Design a protein with these regions (language model features):
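Proline-centered turn/helix-capping motifs that create local helix->coil transitions or kinks
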Residues: 328-337
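Conserved RNase H-like, two-metal-ion catalytic cores of nucleic-acid enzymes
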Residues: 47-49, 56-72, 195-325
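A polyanion-binding, active-site-adjacent surface
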Residues: 1-194
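Mixed-charge, glycine-rich, non-catalytic linkers/tails in nucleic-acid processing enzymes
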Residues: 197-199, 294-297, 337-390
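Hydrophobic faces of stable alpha-helices that mediate helix-helix packing
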Residues: 189, 278-281, 285, 316, ...
Length: 390
């Protein structure tokens, strides 16, 4: 008999804990959690497609997906890849599920999908639509799984050790796919590059202000402040620490702002010959004017605005999300975020209680990734020829 899973009627350990809340799960349901080989390539390179839920026709054939359904996609992929497939919900069900329920089911199946990645060890993972994106990233970000937010990125996922490409929902052309949607899917599949080496992003962190004596005319820096609140207008606020990454260096610097280094820092900020980048520059500009009595000269780029220009979907422009989709690193603010939060925009936070080493390392990473993001955004935006990014 096919019935919904009732956690009270099943012994502990019989199923994964997430099965209890999965709208697609039934005791005795057929599971398709083993990666399914759909195409053998001409080399050792591998690719895993995470698709939608299992269709009735595929299930009747004993497979998670029909080969002809994937054919248009396979024809667009380089022939060197051996291609595997797994549905974002690994249990088959005939129940009518809303889109929201499908996403919940995919979140519940997240560990199955991650296990499949570990088993296949692919060079690339393709995530078709929001449920597949949720399966991988739901527990790693608070930005949701809207495909419009994620598509267009080739994520060098440092946790999974492979490139991840989120895409729109896959509907074959003969199913009546919207021309623009199919065009964007085709464009995004060009991000699968067999010749691209998987990158790592490492930097030395120096928690001194030595960089202040090294900067000269012609340098380009990304910089960031850690402050006692969001806005500087109320009394009692100060710039607690600053971080600087000079483009091309192997070291990012992060240091407490003190009377001893304040004048040199102000000289650098006011210099038009030292070019400057920040993420949401209005924050650094506002705090500089309020605390130092000067404006910042030499601005050349705001990576927050750059992110908006590349993808204006709500939720895209935050630095931590940009770091995830561009450099594959999960949010590194966990150890400090409780100290940086204030109850109101004018309130004072608890930054003074934050462990200094953790705070300075956090700031260094912010400036480093901001610098890398500038280089990538400049390359992307310089190559654009039309309004949809093609």
């Amino acid at each position: 008999m096919d019935y919904l899973f009732d956690i009270n009627n099943v012994s502990s350990g019989s199923f994964g804990t997430d099965c209890a809340r999965c709208p697609a799960f039934s005791i005795g349901a057929k599971s398709y959690k083993e990666p399914f080989l759909v195409k053998t390539g001409t080399s050792t390179k591998k690719l895993l497609i995470v698709g939608s839920r299992v269709s009735k026709m595929a299930h009747m054939s004993g497979m998670p997906v029909m080969a002809e359904y994937l054919e248009p996609i396979l024809n667009l992929l380089p022939s060197v890849y051996t291609v595997y497939y797994i549905p974002s919900i690994t249990c088959y069900t005939e129940r009518d599920l809303t889109h929201e329920q499908v996403i919940v089911g995919a979140k519940c199946c997240g560990q199955n999908i991650i296990d499949a990645v570990k088993q296949v060890k692919p060079d690339y993972v393709l995530l078709f639509d929001s449920p597949a994106i949720a399966a991988i990233y739901d527990k790693r970000t608070d930005k949701g799984c809207n495909a419009e937010l994620w598509r267009g990125n080739r994520i060098p996922d440092q946790t999974l050790g492979c490139f991840v490409i989120p895409l729109f929902r896959y509907i074959t052309p003969r199913q009546g796919a919207d021309n623009t949607q199919w065009l964007l899917i085709q464009e995004d599949l060009k991000l699968v590059d067999p010749n691209l080496a998987f990158p790592s992003f490492t930097i030395k962190v120096d928690t001194t202000d030595a960089i202040l004596q090294k900067l000269t005319a012609g340098d380009t820096i990304a910089f960031d402040y850690e402050t006692t609140g969001l806005k500087p207008d109320n009394s009692g606020h100060r710039i607690y620490s600053a971080s600087i990454y000079r483009l091309g260096d192997d070291t990012a610097y992060s240091f407490l702002v003190t009377k001893a280094n304040c004048e040199r820092l102000k000289a650098i900020l006011s210099s038009r010959e030292i070019k400057k980048i920040a993420h949401n520059i209005k924050m650094e500009e506002r705090w500089t004017r309020k605390m130092f009595g000067i404006g910042v000269n030499g601005w050349i780029w705001d990576t927050c605005l750059g992110a908006h220009c590349i993808n204006s979907t709500r939720g895209n422009s935050g630095l931590k999300f940009q770091v995830l989709v561009n450099f594959g690193r999960d949010d590194y603010s966990k150890s400090v975020e409780q100290y940086l939060h204030a109850e109101t925009s004018n309130g004072v936070n608890a930054i003074h209680n934050c462990p200094i080493d953790s705070l300075l390392e956090y700031g260094a990473w912010d400036s480093y990734y901001c610098g890398l993001l500038y280089l990538k955004q400049y390359e992307i935006l310089s190559s654009r020829v039309n309004s949809i990014g093609l």
